């Protein structure tokens, strides 16, 4: 079938970006994620609580968290909420170097941009009082109060942009701003209080969703703690200090760490963790419903392509059912991996149907990335072999690091029991097979 034009359109339908709320391509994975449902786990607490709440949401990178949060935001907008959603890693933070103040400034910026009903003067007053010490770093001269409110508000975007992109200026800005973060929280809460009074009654409850924070890279500090501990535990009082509902995403390696009970005590609830799609059971048997859901994801993306609505997965798109199954199996139930593998597969062809050889080449390409992320020098292949056999990841830093890199995946079965397995892209590697022989002999 000569399908070059439509193949390009199908390729673009698998753009690995979060789906907006209500997108027809959305697939409901709750039944194969152990019943995990953000509308219940996160949404009910926000909706029912008369006092501001602060919750944490986590999961593997690319596992579908942003899509679920966008769905939650849309749902709560129908229930009387004004929702300020932003992905902090897009414009506000550098995930390789983040401090609490960066997150606070990002929240401030997006609240100012979205909530137009409230008077920004308390926050702009804080900015005015700080501008003398910031002007040399920002390289911008502002005359207060002559400068328009819009121009003053825009300075917060410029501050977060410099913190994100300019390493030297990032350090300077933090040194100048960190002593005044409590004052900023106070000003921000004045703004929030007025917003609640001025917002229309049908949306006068306020929720901030700070996405993208789960991507913050792990950095061990001199005192033996980590930057993750510093941001989400040490600075928790500040993260919780906004007088509105807040949801922060967080690194999965911290959510599943020995600090989990501390997080529950601090935030009043355990972090909600989005598991992988269960495409096989713990004992290794394929789970048909999970595989069907992965096929549904593929079909929903293809159906959205004009002219491809009638294409059958197992006849027109893939050469046979076995080739389709291979693509799904090699993802381990990781949604973004499936989307990216589909694009990789299409790269090797100029027409449909997609051949097994193309899927194998796509798998090989992604496998190289995963293999290179395993550090043989610290015996990580041996750790992976242990998880491959036992189907559980012990709770220590070595295994949590592998979870963060998605070399180990977390699942939740129908009984609510957590289990782990290594990413299937690593299963056939020579290094893993050697490590398995070392354990079993």
Regions found by a protein language model. Name each.
Residues 22-35, 168-192, 295, 311-315:
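Alpha-helix-centered segments that form part of catalytic cores
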Residues 354-441:
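C-terminal leucine-rich, beta-strand-based interaction scaffolds used for sensing/assembly
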Residues 1-76, 80:
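Walker A/P-loop-proximal flanking segment of P-loop NTPase domains
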Residues 189, 193-320:
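The catalytic "switch" region of P-loop NTPases
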Residues 68-70, 95-99, 217-223, 257-263, ...:
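A short acidic (Asp/Glu
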Residues 57-60, 64, 235-242, 246-248, ...:
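Conserved catalytic-core segments centered on acid/base and nucleophilic motifs
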Residues 53-54, 59-204:
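P-loop NTPase nucleotide-binding core
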Residues 317-370:
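Amphipathic alpha-helical "lid/sensor" segments that cap RecA-like P-loop NTPase cores
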């Amino acid at each position: 079938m000569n399908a070059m034009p439509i193949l390009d359109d199908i390729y673009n339908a698998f753009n690995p970006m979060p789906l907006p709320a209500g997108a027809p391509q959305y697939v409901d994975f709750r039944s194969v994620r152990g019943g995990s449902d953000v509308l219940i786990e996160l949404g009910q607490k926000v909706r029912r609580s008369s006092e501001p709440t602060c919750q944490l949401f986590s999961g593997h990178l690319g596992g579908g968290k942003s899509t679920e949060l966008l769905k939650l935001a849309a749902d709560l907008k129908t229930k009387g909420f004004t929702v300020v959603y932003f992905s902090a890693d897009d414009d506000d933070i550098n995930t390789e170097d983040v401090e609490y103040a960066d997150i606070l400034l990002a929240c401030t910026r997006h609240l100012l941009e979205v909530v137009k009903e409230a008077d920004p003067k308390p926050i702009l007053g804080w900015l005015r009082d700080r501008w003398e010490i910031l002007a040399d770093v920002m390289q911008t001269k502002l005359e207060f109060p002559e400068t328009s409110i819009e121009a003053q508000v825009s300075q917060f975007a410029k501050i977060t942009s410099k913190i994100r992109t300019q390493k030297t200026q990032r350090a300077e800005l933090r040194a100048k701003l960190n002593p005044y973060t409590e004052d900023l929280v106070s000003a921000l809460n004045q703004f929030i209080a007025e917003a609640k009074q001025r917002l229309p009654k049908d949306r006068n409850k306020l929720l901030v969703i700070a996405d993208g924070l789960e991507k913050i890279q792990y950095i061990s500090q001199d005192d033996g703690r980590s930057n993750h501990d510093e941001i989400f535990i040490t600075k928790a009082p500040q993260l919780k200090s906004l007088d509105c509902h807040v949801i922060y995403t967080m690194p999965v390696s911290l959510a599943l760490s020995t600090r989990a009970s501390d997080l529950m005590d601090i935030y009043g609830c355990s972090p909600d963790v989005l598991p992988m799609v269960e495409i096989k059971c713990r004992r290794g048997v394929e789970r048909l419903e999970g595989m069907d859901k992965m096929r549904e994801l593929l079909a929903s993306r293809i159906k959205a392509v004009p002219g491809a609505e009638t294409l059958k997965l197992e006849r027109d798109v893939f050469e046979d059912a076995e080739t389709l199954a291979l693509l799904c199996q090699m993802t381990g139930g990781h949604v973004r991996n499936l989307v990216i593998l589909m694009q990789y597969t299409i790269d090797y062809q100029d027409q449909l149907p997609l051949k097994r050889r193309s899927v194998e080449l796509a798998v090989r390409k992604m496998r190289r990335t995963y293999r290179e992320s395993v550090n043989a020098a610290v015996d990580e292949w041996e750790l992976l072999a242990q998880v491959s056999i036992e189907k559980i990841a012990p709770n220590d830093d070595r295994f949590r690091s592998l979870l963060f890199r998605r070399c180990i995946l977390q699942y939740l079965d129908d009984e609510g029991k957590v289990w782990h397995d290594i990413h299937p892209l690593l299963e056939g590697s020579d290094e893993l097979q050697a490590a398995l022989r070392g354990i079993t002999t």
